[in-house]
């Protein structure tokens, strides 16, 4: 038990970060208080500003402080005819770093998981349906994670695209099965994009 309630509170809240356990949270808290109080204040300010000002792009649903993100506002992207569907906002910079894609995105904010109560509406597939109806796409690239849930989600979206006569492809499985897209190295992800395959019924 810590002697300071404020210190206990800080450690407890640092544990909300992914991969941070009690010991790591304790080290962070002591480091900020002992060696970098100004850094801690800057971190607190940045967190407060980000939490209050960053929302979702009205088109692709990634994070942005504007109504539309920079990618969706890019005329070259708007006229590309390509839409890449990903599970998380963090997947976009991973794909962008490959330099192999210059189209637009749609972020699901998850994947289908009926056992957890996550259906099509919970991951924004009603919004994706509207985009497929009202925007012109030559090809939809499905870049969901190569997990059971990711594959099920990709198949569901493929059916939606077939209804609109839109070509559908799935990124190649150079990515390890069960892996997360944002943790894959750039070379592997680049080859996966180049070697994507069309889905056919």
Curated annotation (Swiss-Prot):
NCBIfam families, per database record: recR (TIGR00615)
Family to which the UniProt record says this protein belongs: Belongs to the RecR family.
Q: Which GO terms describe its biological process?
A: DNA recombination; DNA repair
Q: Name one Pfam family in it.
A: RecR_ZnF
Q: Which SMART domains match?
A: TOPRIM
Q: What is this protein called?
A: Recombination protein RecR
- Lineage of the native species? Bacteria, Pseudomonadati, Pseudomonadota, Gammaproteobacteria, Pasteurellales
Zinc fingers, C4-type, are found at 57-72
Q: What S-S linkages are listed for this chain?
A: none
Q: Which organism is it from?
A: Histophilus somni (strain 129Pt)
Q: What does this protein do?
A: May play a role in DNA repair. It seems to be involved in an RecBC-independent recombinational process of DNA repair. It may act with RecF and RecO.
- What gene does the UniProt entry assign to this protein? recR
An MF annotation (GO) of this entry: DNA binding
- Keyword Transmembrane helix listed? The answer is no
The Toprim domain is annotated at 81-176
Question: InterPro entries recorded for this chain?
Answer: DNA_Rcmb_RecR, Rcmb_RecR, Rcmb_RecR_Znf, TOPRIM_dom, TOPRIM_RecR
Keyword set, alphabetical order: DNA damage, DNA recombination, DNA repair, Metal-binding, Zinc, Zinc-finger
């Amino acid at each position: 038990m810590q002697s300071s309630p404020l210190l206990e509170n800080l450690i407890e809240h640092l544990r909300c970060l992914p991969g941070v356990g009690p010991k790591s949270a304790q080290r962070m808290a002591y480091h900020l208080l002992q060696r970098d109080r100004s850094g801690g204040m800057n971190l607190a300010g940045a967190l407060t500003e980000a939490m209050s000002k960053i929302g979702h792009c009205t088109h692709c649903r990634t994070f942005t402080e504007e109504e539309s993100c920079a990618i969706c506002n890019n005329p070259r992207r708007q006229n590309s005819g390509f839409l890449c569907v990903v599970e998380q906002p963090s997947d976009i910079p991973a794909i962008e770093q490959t330099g192999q894609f210059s189209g637009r995105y749609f972020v699901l904010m998850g994947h289908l998981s009926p056992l957890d109560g996550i259906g099509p509406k919970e991951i924004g597939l009603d919004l994706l349906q509207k985009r497929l109806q009202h925007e012109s796409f030559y090809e939809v690239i499905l870049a969901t994670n190569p997990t059971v849930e990711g594959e099920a989600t990709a198949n569901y979206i493929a059916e939606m695209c077939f209804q609109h006569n839109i070509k559908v492809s799935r990124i190649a499985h150079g990515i390890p099965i069960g892996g997360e897209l944002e943790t894959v190295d750039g070379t592997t992800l680049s080859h996966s994009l180049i070697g994507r395959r069309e889905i056919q019924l």
